[in-house]
Amino acid sequence: MKKTMSAITAAAAVTSCFTGFGAASFSAPAKAAAQTNTLSENTNQSAAELVKNLYNTAYKGEMPQQAQGLTINKSTKGDVHAAFGEPERPVGGDNRFDLYHWNMGQPGYGFSYHKDMTISEIRYFGTGVERQLNLGGVTPEVLQKQLGPVNRVLTVPFTDEIDYVYDTGRYELHFVIGTDQTADHVNLKAK
């Protein structure tokens, strides 16, 4: 009787593995695929929203989020320091930007200045945490879908990066795309 019950139990276990009924099931790959699709949809939606936000604020000569209100050719280095504090890496040597690194889910920024200390260029680095939901989700395809045809495409000297330039009124918005075909950073400057 014991051998019969063991054989029945073993047969049931093997059958359940192949049919999907019982303790063992092959639903894990399906669940992983569904999660991947959801992540991809969230990435595309987040990237699309970021692109639109960057584009819309660029018409005012500004970048979004913490940098909003700091305007190209108007706001000063003092205004930047009042808003962000002292830069983690100040202008100097080969570095022409006051750099503020990303942290705690907040994006990083860089600010370059004219001789009169007004902002000449703002650089947006995005976030380091969940980057695929920020600049890591911005691709040439996302730019085309959200903003339409690019005004100019430039090659960044000494790198393999491509610069997709969109005119935004009196300003230019530069999406610098790396070799992985995602945005490395975004620059805003006056024409």
UniProtKB/Swiss-Prot annotation:
It comes from the Bacteria. The keyword Signal applies. InterPro entries: DUF4309. Keywords: Signal. Residues 1-23 form the signal peptide. The keyword Nucleotidyltransferase does not apply. This is Uncharacterized protein YjgB. It comes from Bacillus subtilis (strain 168).
